[in-house]
């Protein structure tokens, strides 16, 4: 029993013990959490006191400095990173808009990037106005670190081997300054503005932020900070330094210089190590912005090093733990820098020197501040020399009467620049104006740096009013109501934070000259901002308003012109050609053509050509040419053609041609010809014909013909014929003819013929004939010709042709032609021709022909004929002749005139017809054989 009780008691005692342990554990966790919260609050509040101690270079603050750089990278500070990220995003409007002194038509200068540098900006807080939009911890954190310049905000940023990883200001800032939560101070001092008043603005903004957390001991946080790093400036290798600028820098025209750096980091570098970049005192890194900041060096999306500006204006970079895990780290950096108005007050040559360690770069530039604007006795110039977009303030400095002229009843007005969406607020609540008198014009600095202590403050003696919205007015109220010395007017104003416009101001000086003529002179200032990129800079330019009474002339202000001339031309051409040609060409042509051409040609030509042509053509051609030509051509042509041609030609030609032609042609041709001809012809003909012929012929002919003919004919013919023929002929002929014919005929015939013939003949003939013939013929022929021709022709033709030809020609031609043609041609030609022709013809023809012929002939003929005919009047029943060489079977509906030799003439006509049909059949067969191949 007792044993059981003991066991029961022991179990109960054990249960009570477990519960006690659990309760105690929970209470312990609660106490620990409370202490951690207190520590967090203390660390932020302690930054406030630490920021002031940093000015005395406390040793503990130096040892804590490295933590400023990389806490964001650490995973153990996640909550701090979030707060800081929110802070920097809220500070977006206050990012590094480094602007140079700005004047008329100010231009925005974005930060240039070289090498691997990527342009970006960071948005760390400078003033309580921005930090109030962040979380409580981050807010107090940034407020206290403003004087420590741990914020990393400037114009450019360099990435290590990652030029493509450009980040905007918001992203960069989320990875910075978290370390200030645990780092009360830094070994770098606050950024120094070149203007004493700038310092006041920044310090005042910081000090107005009252800490919300209770203070605690500095040692409590310093114990957690790592020891200070080593200056490894002289251990950097492959250091490059460059100064990029023109030979002249115009500070009041957005002028600046670029400082370029590159280096390799030793593998022994660790987190907290630093290096130093020396910046010449003649430059500053802020332009006209109120504070100067430098970019962090980024490696992709990680911070490699953070930078601050020390009291001497040099840049100190501190490495993060990125270098602990990487070897062969390389970096490039580009920073824009501006001429410092305090250290460079006059126009002149300045030598700039910058470097990393023992590696330096030097460059001498001419600093040109340019002169004020002057109009008669009025002179004025202004500049916006300070912008604080965090507090939405600006400062404008205006030189009134810098020339020291006598101005009677002077009045200065300030307005928003006309025709702009200026964001300035000009009224009694938002604008403060100071006026200083300058006894000697030589005391004015050309850089517009003003030390108020050097001049007499006459603000209380002048009359300052705001007569209209967004306008102020300054009346100088001198005893004699005139000024003879310069005055400085300093305007401290505000910017409308809700406006999307840029800062644009106009200052105007009014006054009388000694002739009591009222005049005015204006000066415009403008600054444009580029959020998240670089700087905003201005361009100075005087503006002369319209004058109520103007005896003199105003020098015109040059304007910029923007022109974009453009021409559109397009051509579609596919050609494969090999050509060997020598040509002398003189041409006078006006042409309007649209062409689509596909050609493959091999051509060997030597030509002499003199041509004057006017041509209007639209052509579609597909050609495959192999031509060998030697031509001398003298042509004067006027042609208007519309042609479609498909040709495949092999030609070897040697031609001399003299032609004067006017042609207007529209033709469709489909031809297949094989011709070999040798002819000498001298003809002078006048023909006027109107024919309608419908023929259907199939001809297959094989002919051997040896002809030698000399023909001298002079004919005038006027014929009107209608012929309809259907012929089938099969002939085999051998002909050998030698004919001399001399005919002079005048014929006027009107014939209608309709013939249908079937002939099969085999003949050998040797004939000598004298014939007088009157014929109208419609023929389809294949010819081989060698001709010399001299022609003068006027032709008007409309043809459709499809040709396949192989030609070799040697021709001397002289032609004068007027032609109107519209052609569609599809040709494949192989021709061998040698021709000498001299012709003078006037022809006007209108023909409709449809022919289909089937003929097969084989003829050998040997003929010798001599004919001497005298010309008789038309319609004469006797001795009427037709000098035509055409062969045609005709069935006359009217009795033919008595020629005196009917049997012999009919026999010759029949044999000629048979020979013609035979040749047609022969060449048709050749064509079919060729097509089959």
Swiss-Prot record:
Propeptide: 900-933
Location in or out of the cell: Secreted, Cell wall
Matches recorded under Pfam families: Big_8 (PF17961), Gram_pos_anchor (PF00746), SdrG_C_C (PF10425), YSIRK_signal (PF04650)
Biased composition (Polar residues): 71-105, 163-200
Alphabetical keyword list: Cell wall, Peptidoglycan-anchor, Secreted, Signal, Virulence
Motif (YSIRK-G/S signaling motif): 9-20
Residue interval(s) of motif LPXTG sorting signal: 896-900
PROSITE patterns linked: GRAM_POS_ANCHORING
Chain spans, region Ligand binding A region: 40-542
Modified sites of kind Pentaglycyl murein peptidoglycan amidated threonine: 899
Signal peptide extent: 1-39
Residues covered by region (Disordered): 34-200, 529-904
Any GO BP annotation: cell adhesion
Mode of membrane association: Peptidoglycan-anchor
Residues that span the membrane, as ranges: none
Biased composition (Low complexity): 47-65, 106-132, 143-162, 566-598, 862-880
GO cellular component: extracellular region
Composition-biased stretches (Basic and acidic residues): 887-896
Biased composition (Acidic residues): 547-565, 599-861
Domain of life the protein comes from: Bacteria
Stored InterPro entries: Adhesin_Fg-bd_dom_2 (IPR011266), Adhesion_dom_sf (IPR008966), Fibrogen-bd_dom1 (IPR011252), LPXTG_anchor (IPR019931), SDr-like (IPR050972), SDR_Ig (IPR041171), YSIRK_signal_dom (IPR005877)
Record's function text: Cell surface-associated protein implicated in virulence. Promotes bacterial attachment exclusively to the gamma-chain of human fibrinogen. Induces formation of bacterial clumps.
Family per similarity comment: Belongs to the serine-aspartate repeat-containing protein (SDr) family.
Protein name: Clumping factor A
Organism: Staphylococcus aureus (strain COL)
Gene symbol of the encoding locus: clfA
